[in-house]
Amino acid sequence: MDNILVNNKNKNLLDLNKEDIKKSCEIEDKIFHSKTVNDVDLNLNSKNDISSKMKFIMDVPVHLTIEVGTVKITIKDLLELRSKSILVLDKHAGDPLNILVNGYVIATGELVVTENKYGIRIINIIDNSVFKKL
């Protein structure tokens, strides 16, 4: 019969009883007392409930990227890049730019210059249904 390791003691599977399993779970719960989404009572019945329960995530920083274009090159070509090398991207001048949040495209926009700084004017939000629920 196979032996298993439970709480650093070798016990035969048949020797495990409900009390052993309960103790093991209690120890694991004390060590790993993190909660999963299922453990949290979201009770999202109204717009106010959602707002109050989601308030804590509103200050979480996200990484916003404006993608001018992409190019696929070999490692050999990458290693040969030098100052003044030019990479030809897959987009044309004037094409909408992708706006990504944490790597996911959420919108498109166009490049603008304001007060000698680059900016992006939002043209289209890809899917804002998540925001409408808040």
UniProtKB/Swiss-Prot annotation:
Compartments (UniProt record): Cell membrane; Bacterial flagellum basal body
Keyword set, alphabetical order: Bacterial flagellum, Cell membrane, Chemotaxis, Flagellar rotation, Membrane
Top-rank lineage group of the source organism: Bacteria
Keyword Cell division applies: no
UniProt GO BP: bacterial-type flagellum-dependent cell motility; chemotaxis
Any one GO molecular function term: cytoskeletal motor activity
Keyword Signal on entry: no
Purpose of the protein: FliN is one of three proteins (FliG, FliN, FliM) that form the rotor-mounted switch complex (C ring), located at the base of the basal body. This complex interacts with the CheY and CheZ chemotaxis proteins, in addition to contacting components of the motor that determine the direction of flagellar rotation.
Cited NCBIfam families: fliN
PANTHER family: FLAGELLAR MOTOR SWITCH PROTEIN FLIN (PTHR43484:SF1), PTHR43484
Similarity comment text for this entry: Belongs to the FliN/MopA/SpaO family.
The protein's name: Flagellar motor switch protein FliN
Species per Swiss-Prot/TrEMBL record: Buchnera aphidicola subsp. Baizongia pistaciae (strain Bp)
